[in-house]
Every structure is written in structure tokens, then in C-alpha cells.
Amino acid sequence: MSDFIFTSESVTEGHPDKICDQISDAVLDALLKEDPESRVACETVVNTGLCLLTGEITSRAKLDYIKLVRKVIKEIGYEGAKAGGFDSNSCAVLVALDEQSPDISQGVNEADDLNEDLENNTGAGDQGIMFGYACDETPELMPLPISLAHRLARQLAKVRHENVLEYLLPDGKTQVSIDYKKGVPVSINTILISTQHRAEIDGIINEKEIRQKITDDLWINVVLPVTEDLEIKPSKEKTRFLVNPTGKFVVGGPQGDAGLTGRKIIVDTYGGYARHGGGAFSGKDPTKVDRSAAYAARYVAKSIVKAKLAKKAEVQLSYAIGVAKPISILVDTFGTSVISQDNLKELIENNFDLRPAAIIKEFDLRNLPKKLGGEFYRKTASYGHFGRNDLNLPWESVEVKAAQLVEASKDFL
């Protein structure tokens, strides 16, 4: 099927699930800042007036978890009576954290199939499969639907934080449908934005009038600014633009829906455009291959596309708990590569060290929170972990590796 419509969604930082992702990653940042060897598997739950912090943590760091949770909730925008029914100052914060099981840690601490230096003897923290993807649809080598959905969600939050549209509240979602012809994006079919807002806007209380005002304001302040640099632009004549289709969105955030860490894994990755291994990222330290190996798989896929060895590349990695080397490596370029799949796999094996400790070292995943003032992973917890031009993410910096692949691939051309 070469002609189709593909749709991806994103959510703002005030979405209940994203509140949880940010809290879990804020805990991870704080622990790694004080103790880079911390083992963290932190889960968060939010509901009306409640935040629960749970999971397993082994660390020398000492944190005021309740204070940290309230800080994150406040910075998102949930503070005071006007914040949409969830208040950082008054919500209950419960902490129920345990230590990591010794049965898990013994397999992670030293893998049994390597005899090299101890640094590279770290086994995978769990079994699992991870996918990485890249394509040439956007400058950041991401699929256009998720790229644009993230742009819209970030801009929606920006105009709220900067009081450009002071009636907006923290919860919100975006969705973008792109028309493809012969597998290439050609136009923006539909843009959907659902955003929480105050019940009264500039003295307007009529539901229909409120929705029309929000629609007009979002087109001017959100849609147009984030699409001005795109080759494919929306138009009021050809692009369907939907805003709050149910009519109003006053009750939102944790007051409207419960939230949980790890429930937006498609938003975090490729918007459904590529396969997903099922593992979430937030709240997990770098020994968890759900996170670190997914970053590495993206690094490999993006390097391949950046090197122009393929227009699209999907890389699957699999691991076994306590074993350092990947159990399997698979690459699929969907018929777009200039060399064979077997040759691409050989290039990957010869140019990328995909053992967990090597990935951690390559990207400096344990030390980045401390180097960056105590906040790194939390910034990835909203608006995607990949294709982030607003963040300096090591797995997105592929120029050097792509050049290596160009040189190494000459033997196969």
C-alpha cells in the first residue's frame, strides 16, 4: 500500500500519564546526580488529589521524595485553585519504595559470557526486545506525523507557560494525520488539538463561542508557528482542523483521569510508524535495556539513514537478563537500502558495541544528570525521546558514526 493516511498523537506535559513519566524521571535524575551507580525502577501513579511513588531503588543518595514530587507538579502548572483541580501544594503524596531484588542485581552486575575488563561485563537488566527507527521524512530523520504532533504539543504548552493564551490549562493532546502518495508524505490531512481550558474565557461562557475562540487562537498561535518551516504546510481550505471535538475540556489532568508511568510508549517513540518492543523508558536507570538499548537502536538506525545507506531503517535488538551481548540483531530497510541487509548487519556488528555497559559509556548515561545540573532524563519524558532538536541527546548525534559507516560501506558498494 503506497497511498495512505497515517496518524500519530502526542500529549502535553500536563497529561496525567506524562505527569507520572516526568516525576519518575525527576527521581531518576536526582538519584543519579548524587550517586551515578543508582539502580532505579520508579513508578508513579496520579489520581484526584493523590500521587503515589512506588518501585525499587538501590542508591546511596538521600532524597526528599515528597518535596521533589511537589516541585515537578508545580512546574508543570498544577498549582492553586485555578490549575484545573490538581494542586501541587495540597495533593497527598505517598511514597512506597523498596530496594532492587538481589536476584536481579547479581545478573546485572557481572555478565557470565565476557572475560574482558569488568566495565564491560555488565549484563542486561532484563530480557526484552527493543526497536530503533529512522527515515528521511524530516531533517531530524523522524516520521512526519509524530514529529509534527510533538511540535504542536510543545507549542501548546509554550503559549500556556508564557501566558500568550492565559485561559489554557495544563492537560492537552495533539494528533496529526498525513496523506502519503507512493509512500511519501504530500499533505496534512487533519490536525486535532484537545486542550484543557478555563470555563470562562474573556467573559465568554457560551460553549460554542468558547470553542470557536480557542480554535482561532490555536490556529494563529500554535499551528502556524510550528509549520512555517515545513515544506508541507496546513491550510484552512485543505486541512481539517479539529479543536476539543466534545465541545469543552474544563475538567482534566489527574482530576479527569488517573495517570501512570509508562503508558505513553508510542508517543515516546515513533508514533506507531515503527514497531515497539513494549518496554517503557521513564523511571528506569541506564542498566535497564528497555531504555538504553532503545536509545542505541535509534542511534544505529539514524546513523544508517544519515549515511544515506537507506531511506528508512528499523533495527531490532534483543537481550537476556545477565548476558552482555545482544541475543540478536535485525535490520530492515523496507527495500530502500543501497547495500544488502546482510551487509548492513555486518556493518552494525563491526561498528557498534551494543553491550549495555558500552552503551552507557558511549552516551555517558549515568553522568549526564550531574553534568547538566540535575536534570536530563526528565526533559525526555515529554514530547518524545527521539528527534529532539531542542535537546542535546547523545543518541541523536550521529554525524561521526554516519561518516564511519560511509567509509566502511565502500567495501560493499
Swiss-Prot record:
Assembly behavior: Homotetramer; dimer of dimers.
Organism whose genome encodes this protein: Prochlorococcus marinus (strain MIT 9515)
Residues annotated to bind L-methionine: 56, 100, 257, 288
PANTHER family hit by this protein: S-ADENOSYLMETHIONINE SYNTHETASE
E.C. numbers: 2.5.1.6
Described function: Catalyzes the formation of S-adenosylmethionine (AdoMet) from methionine and ATP. The overall synthetic reaction is composed of two sequential steps, AdoMet formation and the subsequent tripolyphosphate hydrolysis which occurs prior to release of AdoMet from the enzyme.
GO molecular function, one term: ATP binding
Cofactors: Mg(2+); K(+)
Pathway(s) served: Amino-acid biosynthesis; S-adenosyl-L-methionine biosynthesis; S-adenosyl-L-methionine from L-methionine: step 1/1
Record: residues binding Mg(2+): 17
Binding residues annotated for K(+), in chain numbering: 43
Keyword 4Fe-4S annotated: no
Binding site for ATP: 15, 171-173, 248-249, 257, 263-264, 280, 284
Domain of life the protein comes from: Bacteria
Name this polypeptide is given: S-adenosylmethionine synthase
HAMAP family per UniProt: S_AdoMet_synth1
